């Protein structure tokens, strides 16, 4: 029976202290990169112009509110950079046009940005604080989930280290955009499901060892890690709607894991067992619970008369039952308009790119660029924030993803399948919008793919190093190859670092860091 347990549930590394201390040290390193000079540049960077003001309005009104100025003349941006927070449009009555603001994304990511603004004030450090926190936490989570998937603390720390020095993750961890929060909740949901996989297999093996076999096996009861995954993925959808691709994909993947576990213990009807015994729990945990989280994220809109499309006077014109009915009707109408906006978003932008070009880093987004008068030892200086990944990691990641395809075809290893599927959930849906709608898209949308690309690199590193019982010379050579790659990634990040974090450097040095003309 022990062999069945070991086969279904390989033992975790025995050193629990290093299992936490190693990932924490890697996260601290990533935190230093993200928090040092977090308030630089002292400017409103790219789409921060929307989310930092929305976050401020949510803190004070519970809903987003219109601000002074336009895209061409951002009066509000200049006011808040000077410390003036009186930048919201005032209306009498307060729910009259144009004060209610139409927004295209759910509120949760902006509420998270608002936490930093509440603690540190409405300044660049304050509005970027939450992004940096979740960036560091995602390093820790990735290190821990990689450790669980590989049963190796060393490989877990490698995954965290690679995410620490991944350029796009670094930039988004230092910028108040929504995508870093989306990535965080997606990764957290994935980590919970991997933990649930182990938990469920442990329950199944215990049943197998102590009960007579049946064709389908038992129901596995309340599954806390699956519930946690539902909460996280509901939060992902409450940041951006693209979280739903992961919610659906992960739910199917988790159900297939259940069927695989039942097959592995020798049940004759594993799929009927999984669908018959586990489908209800997955619908609750990955269906109703995420929907509940999503609706709750709109609590400010439901509770305030000031939200766009709220129709408060109409909703309160009759009794409580009509209030609930009319509020839901207005909320759904709002969502239909947002859906129309997203499907028809085809305006051109100088930094837009197609999803098939993202893995090659062909067109990054210049979040910020100035030619400051500050002396930098040259006649012309540059200060830039370029939203681009670390090329060594991304191009190495392509090789690793191809390795995962070969590995999965050859062995059906669940880890390769999970990484490939998760990467696809963050990438392939955008092909539809690019082809059918010609939708405006950007490289930084690929941030949700990045943790799974790094997991592919980590699993490939494990294959290169070899099993613990492999010949010492073979493992030493593999470790040297992996170490050399990691060193190259560190050097590559160090080379790019000035144009990722807005250091003032000579223009010639900025230009040498533009790997392709399309980067400039």
Name these PLM-found stretches.
Residues 50-120, 124, 207-218, 367-385:
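Interfacial juxtamembrane loops and adjacent helix segments
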């Amino acid at each position: 029976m022990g062999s069945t347990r070991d086969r279904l549930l390989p033992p975790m590394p025995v050193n629990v202290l290093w299992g936490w201390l190693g990932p924490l040290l890697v996260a601290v390193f990533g935190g230093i990169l993200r928090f040092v000079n977090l308030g630089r540049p002292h400017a409103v960077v790219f789409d921060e112009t929307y989310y930092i003001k929305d976050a401020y309005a949510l803190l004070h009104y519970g809903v987003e509110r219109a601000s002074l100025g336009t895209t061409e003349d951002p009066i509000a941006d200049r006011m808040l950079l000077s410390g003036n927070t009186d930048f919201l449009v005032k209306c009498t009555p307060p729910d009259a046009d144009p004060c209610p603001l139409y927004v295209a994304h759910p509120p949760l990511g902006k509420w998270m940005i608002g936490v930093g603004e509440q603690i540190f004030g409405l300044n660049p450090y304050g509005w970027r604080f939450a992004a940096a926190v979740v960036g560091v936490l995602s390093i820790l989570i990735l290190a821990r989930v990689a450790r669980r998937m590989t049963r190796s603390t060393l490989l877990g720390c490698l995954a965290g280290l690679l995410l620490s020095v991944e350029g796009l993750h670094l930039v988004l961890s230092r910028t108040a955009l929504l995508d870093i929060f989306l990535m965080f909740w997606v990764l957290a949901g994935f980590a919970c499901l991997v933990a649930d996989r182990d938990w469920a297999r442990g329950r199944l093996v215990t049943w197998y060892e102590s009960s007579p076999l049946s064709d389908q096996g038992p129901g596995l009861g309340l599954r806390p890690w699956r519930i946690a995954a539902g909460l996280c993925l509901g939060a992902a959808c409450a940041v951006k709607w693209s979280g739903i691709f992961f919610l659906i994909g992960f739910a199917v993947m988790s159900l297939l894991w259940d069927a695989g576990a039942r097959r592995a213990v020798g049940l004759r009807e594993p799929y009927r067992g999984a669908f018959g015994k586990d489908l209800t729990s997955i619908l609750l945990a990955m269906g109703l619970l995420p929907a509940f989280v999503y609706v709750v994220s709109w609590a400010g809109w439901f509770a305030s008369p000031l939200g766009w499309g709220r129709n408060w006077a109409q909703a309160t014109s009759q009794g409580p039952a009509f209030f609930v009915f009319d509020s839901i009707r207005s909320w759904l109408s709002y969502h239909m308009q947002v859906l129309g906006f997203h499907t028809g978003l085809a305006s051109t932008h100088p930094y837009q790119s197609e999803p098939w070009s993202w893995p090659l880093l062909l067109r990054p987004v210049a979040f910020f660029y100035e030619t400051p008068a500050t002396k930098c030892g040259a006649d012309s200086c540059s200060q830039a924030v370029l939203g681009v990944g670390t090329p060594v990691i991304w191009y190495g990641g392509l090789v690793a993803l191809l390795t995962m395809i070969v590995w999965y075809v050859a062995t059906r290893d669940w880890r390769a399948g999970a990484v490939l599927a998760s990467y696809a959930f963050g990438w392939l849906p955008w092909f539809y919008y690019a082809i059918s709608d010609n939708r405006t898209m950007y490289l930084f949308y690929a941030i949700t793919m990045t943790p799974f690309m790094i997991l592919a690199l980590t699993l490939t590193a494990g294959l290169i190093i070899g099993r613990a019982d492999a010949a010492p010379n073979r493992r030493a050579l593999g470790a040297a190859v992996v170490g050399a790659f990691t060193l190259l990634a560190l050097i590559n990040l160090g080379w790019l670092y000035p144009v990722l974090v807005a250091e003032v450097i000579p223009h010639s040095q900025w230009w040498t860091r533009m790997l392709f003309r399309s980067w400039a």
